[in-house]
Amino acid sequence: MKFFAFLVLLALAFSYDGNAAVNYALRYCKNYNPSYNKYPGVDCANFVSQCLKAGGFSFSGCSGKDSKGMLPAVSDLKSCLSKNGWSKSSTRPGAFKKGYPFFMNAYSHAMLATKINSGSVNYAGHTNDRCGDVTISSGVTYYYL
């Protein structure tokens, strides 16, 4: 059974396309995709969910999905990532790449990394719509495969 779980996690790691997620994020970071629900003032997890879907992430087994299959609540997105093989770290791990999600302020805000620099991460996000801004490195929880 452990070997099977390893194969599932390995398949997840190779089926997610971070570049596709970033391309989606940069296309919709300043506007909203009309194909999905909009949550004015609290759209961050919904937007990151859309980016992850564009990258090929499957939300199977996740609770809290809206009518379009996205996760509008940060807590549900965090739980879904953990259930689907993503690890987390309070320091930026070497495995963290562009196209991966991260959270600030004790999981109250979700964003997607659009570029990784030696000392910072550029990101896209909704609520206060951001497109390629640079984030601080404190108070961040990174998710990675």
Feature map (PLM): residue ranges:
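Glycine-rich, aromatic-bearing surface loops/beta-hairpins
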Residues: V121-L145
